[in-house]
Amino acid sequence: EYMLLSRLYNIFGHMKIQMKKQQAKSIHVERAIDYIYENYSKNISVTDIAEYLGIDRTYLYRLFKEEYNMSPQKYLLNFRLKTAMNKLEGGNMSIAYNCGFNDASAFCHQFKKVYKDTPLNYRRYPQLAIRE
């Protein structure tokens, strides 16, 4: 009976350690996402995010891959494009700059690459767009 209790104690202790490690990872990802939400309209990079969190850039990539199956760079791009899509529906003219793209051409290129349509077509016919 003592052996069984000792073994259970060890198992639960190990589980507790693993849960704390997972929570720490999740906190880094949550803070990274908060940073993205607050700064997406600026010219930020994955290095900026990692430095803000005080962690290694490679580690940040790994955390995002585990959590979202994509890089933080891809997450940032998707967030910018979805924000732009919402602004297109509202008719905002300075969408590219407001969403952190350096110029309208880069924005249009990325938008078309991801959504297979131009921002102008999306603005004209938002009801026809395929939503992710």
Residue ranges of model-derived segments:
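An amphipathic alpha-helical interaction segment
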Residues: 1-37, 55-61
